[in-house]
């Protein structure tokens, strides 16, 4: 079958890499892709937010299955249009994507479903939000309501920081994402993520992961889209996974069905775990990035069967075969990220890296210029390895990085520390 993946990051590179291992797959097309994806797939240029352009590509390239990687096309309703045209598509509807695109919506769903999460209040204007912060005190978590590329969440350790965050959100720092704000209690515990596939009725867990959102070692500095991840997450043992599904995910899915917007796709539950009890931090309605990379490294080609069954509503027949392995990904980013950074810097040494089922350098913000691979984004490379233990996987990843010649790049040197 011919498959079209929408997206251009390390997530999409890892999905393409895994899907290509399945004998059902004939050709993989990716739009817009990147330099690394272009080495293993056909990259095509279309506006992935424009459903008409996506439909045209589906017909032109005889596509049998469309997989939507990032959140923006989901928020734009591309999945709805494709499904209405009878195209087999993996990705939730625009309505059910609100579990990610609106923090306020998610909180209301959790309230109705009785799913444990942080206490909160939402505000549509500045002054009441400022007054609330002064009343509550710190620490607090301030969230822009809409999509902000993973950077719209501020953990405010003092009142002044919280006040500044709210002023920046309402002042337009996050564009349309900042038309309203959610202010939450600061939850204590350890954060980790559970990924499940949902076909509207059946819930299938497909792995756990822990990412590293802060830019600096020791989880310091600014929030980013993610500087690395590893799987499995030790804190998410089977007991905690079962509690998460029973107390959080299943009640959420029932509430979505009751509202006439059943969820189908992948649901990423960001969790805070304390004393083996999970509370919901956030939902994402697509594979995380960089969490997807470690999941794909462990799942391989069987993921295509699971994605197809999800899209067809036949998830009840699927079983995931797990190896007793560990995977880690270390993100190499452009100096200055998550602030301003230089584009067009040349990356050497990539051709000499090992590449097999245990070692892959997934590309994110790269492109090809004059025959050379150059950086054109903030997060640029995802050095990903798999081994029998986490420490072995970690050593392999950092050994691979030593062979990459990119003076303008940087990376955290402690990815995986919580699991060791």
Model-inferred region functions:
Residues 1-94:
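ATP-binding N-terminal substructure of ATP-dependent carboxylate-amine bond-forming enzymes
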Residues 38-40, 55, 98-104, 216-217:
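Short, charged, surface-exposed secondary-structure boundary motifs
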Residues 43-49, 121-125, 156:
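Short acidic-hydrophobic, aromatic-tinged amphipathic segments that line or gate anion-handling sites
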Residues 90-152:
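A conserved helix-loop-beta module that forms one wall/lid of the active-site cleft
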Residues 152-292:
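Internal nucleotide-binding/catalytic subdomain
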Residues 245-267, 284-356, 369:
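Active-site "cap" helix and flanking loop/linker of ATP-utilizing ligase/carboxylase catalytic domains
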Residues 366-370, 374-420:
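Generic C-terminus detector
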